[in-house]
Design a protein with these regions (language model features):
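Small-residue-rich beta-alpha loop regions that form the catalytic core of phosphotransfer
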Residues: 1-155
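Generic preference for hydrophobic
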Residues: 3, 34, 179, 221-223
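Short, acidic Gly/Pro/Ser/Thr-rich loop/turn segments
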Residues: 9-11, 136-139, 200-203, 228-231, ...
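Conserved strand-to-helix beginnings and helix N-cap segments that scaffold or border functional pockets
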Residues: 14-18, 205, 233-234
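Short, solvent-exposed amphipathic alpha-helical segments in soluble enzyme
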Residues: 18-21, 74-75, 145-146, 209-212, ...
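ATP/pyrophosphate-binding catalytic subdomain of soluble kinases
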Residues: 124-218
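ATP/nucleoside-binding phosphotransfer catalytic cores, i.e., glycine-rich phosphate-binding loops
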Residues: 181-182, 213-216, 223-298
């Protein structure tokens, strides 16, 4: 088994519990190679080159580590199952699959070897585990400081996200976008574009379409049109507060793939991390591409 972990994630809880985690894995019959990550991209590079050498790959950290785990296995083309021990601030993907928040319970759950093939997304040839997005609120996870996240937890995201309703922020993070999918197309001014497989974003279920699934072979997409009045801004706030979608401002679709063209470069987030700036993106589902350990009831 390969076990990679981010020693800086959360409050260093994995590092503190490392001996107990390794004991659980050893009792489960595995010889374990342990690799703490040294920098961003470290786990992705190692997993993509060496995944085929292991019977099981387990990673622990926040959403960034999850991204590297999924992308690394995808890039390796190896048919290897995996486990994920969430130790970040929010952990949307883990929550969607009911993966235990308690580190020890999660390690024990992985040793039950109950694996579920879940969908991944392909983004311009790359890969994401649960979300690709740009626009309103999408940069909160990576512009919020690590110290603030460790000290305040989810509240840190809320405090950072309050600026998302400032007029200057709304102007800078919206623009004309053309979206084409297998069931139609639309061109308009958009403030928020989200494509993924998750039940929550930033810990909030309100900004994810109803009926979202990680195993249906489809991407769950939501697009919010740019507000042009205080009334429009109030409608957007209702999405966050009450999960109330206004048909005039919001478009929700399920699709196996779509293309997005923008009049200006937008900053994308992939699994809560910086994904780069693009004026166009081709996004497709990768059905059942990640075989991950989940609780029996997930």
């Amino acid at each position: 088994m390969l076990f990679t972990y981010n020693p800086l994630s959360g409050k260093g809880t994995v590092k503190q519990a490392l001996s107990d985690i390794l004991t659980i894995f050893t009792k489960g019959g595995y010889e374990v190679l342990v690799r703490p990550t040294l920098c961003a991209g470290d786990a992705l590079e190692y997993i993509s080159r060496n995944a085929a050498e292991f019977d099981l790959i387990v990673s622990s950290g926040g959403d960034g580590m999850l991204h590297e785990l999924a992308y690394g296995i995808y890039a390796s083309k190896a048919d290897v199952p995996c486990g994920y021990i969430p130790s970040g601030t929010i952990n949307d993907f883990a929550a969607s699959l009911r993966i235990p928040k308690n580190i020890i319970r999660c390690a024990e759950m992985i040793m039950q070897e109950n694996f579920l093939p879940v969908d991944l997304g392909r983004f311009n040839g790359g890969c994401f585990a649960y979300i690709s997005a740009f626009g309103w609120f999408t940069d909160v996870s990576y512009v919020t400081g690590q110290k603030s996240k460790a000290r305040l937890g989810p509240l840190a995201y809320v405090l950072t996200g309050l600026r998302s309703f400032e007029p200057k922020y709304l102007r800078e993070n919206s623009g004309r976008v053309r979206i084409v999918w297998d069931g139609g197309d639309i061109e308009d001014e958009f403030i928020y574009c989200m494509i993924g497989n998750t039940h929550s974003v930033g810990g909030m279920r309100s900004i994810v379409p109803d009926g979202a699934s990680l195993t249906d072979g489809l991407l769950d997409c939501m697009f919010v049109k740019t507000p042009h009045s205080l009334a429009d801004i109030d409608k957007i706030k209702q999405i966050v507060i009450n999960h109330k979608f206004d048909s005039d401002r919001t478009i929700c679709i399920k699709t196996a793939g779509l293309s997005i063209s923008c009049e200006k470069p937008f900053r994308w987030t992939l699994d809560g991390e910086r994904g780069g700036e693009y004026t166009s993106a081709q996004i497709d589902v990768l059905p059942g591409a990640l075989n991950i350990a989940v609780p029996p009831q997930a």
